Amino acid sequence: FAHCLRVRSRAEVEAFYRAALEAGARDNGAPGPRPEYEENYYACFVLDPDGYNIEAMLNEPAPQG
């Protein structure tokens, strides 16, 4: 079972990750690019105390140009 939270910035992904770990969650993937999902996907993953995976993600628009 998993939950995914869409956020507005990389800073919010990183803040979620830090807050979750401080609250007792376990690391399941530090903040970073996830090109295996999509080219501009940035996310982190934590496991809550019940073992559920929680993701904070940002799918940024492709660069223009």
Language model segments and positions:
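Vicinal oxygen chelate
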Residues: 3-49
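Glycine-rich acetyl-CoA-binding "A-motif" of GNAT/NAT acetyltransferases
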Residues: 53
